[in-house]
Regions:
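Activation corresponds to long, low-complexity, non-globular regions
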Residues: 100-181
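Accessory beta-strand-rich segments of carbohydrate-active enzymes
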Residues: 1-128
Length: 181
């Protein structure tokens, strides 16, 4: 089996072999920026390619969210908590004999990049998405070695059930459109 334990500085989405993992949106949610971050654990065995010699791609898209974007700070001033987004993940593999192996995100085996169709994403300012972006922005030749982020010194705690989910049954449908002059 395979479990992926994750957290981030900023809002993130997870993908395994191109498949979105998890139903929550705005992960890891809003917490005290200096004291706690929430972690999420996913069973990802079904998303893995298990053929001999197969390559599995674990990808994460991280945007500033409440971490590195405009917010109102605890002092009441507009500011940012951190300056750079970050991600931490650990993959736990359990083999047929019960033994386990752990593979963690790091600056030697993982790749990172800032290219892609999402040019800016913020909690209050929305998202800027460039649909003209050509495929291949997430290929290894476009990515580089990630930087280590040491801005957060708080505690990482498991998710406590206060997540946000997209609910299609609550989506609004336009009834009429008009031009306002």
């Amino acid at each position: 089996s395979a479990r992926w334990m994750t957290t981030g500085l900023g809002v993130y989405e997870l993908y395994v072999n191109g498949k979105l993992i998890g139903e929550e949106i705005l992960k890891p949610g809003f917490t005290h920026p200096y004291k706690t971050k929430r972690s999420f654990t996913y069973e990802v065995s079904n998303a893995l390619s298990k053929q001999a010699g197969a390559e599995n791609v674990f990808a994460v898209q991280v945007t500033p969210g409440w971490w590195a974007d405009k917010i109102i700070t605890y002092s009441g001033q507009q500011g940012m908590v951190g300056t750079k987004v970050a991600f931490r993940g650990v993959l736990e593999l359990t083999y047929a004999d019960g033994s386990k192996a752990y593979l963690g995100s790091n600056t030697s085996d993982w790749k990172a990049g800032i290219a892609g169709p999402v040019k800016h994403a913020a909690i209050f300012d929305g998202e800027e998405y460039d649909a003209r972006e050509l495929p291949g922005y997430d290929t290894l030749d476009k990515l580089s070695t990630p930087e280590k982020n040491t801005e957060f010194e708080g505690e990482i705690l498991p998710s406590n059930g206060g997540e946000v989910y997209f609910r299609e049954d609550l989506a609004l449908s336009p009834q009429k459109a008009y031009l306002w002059k």
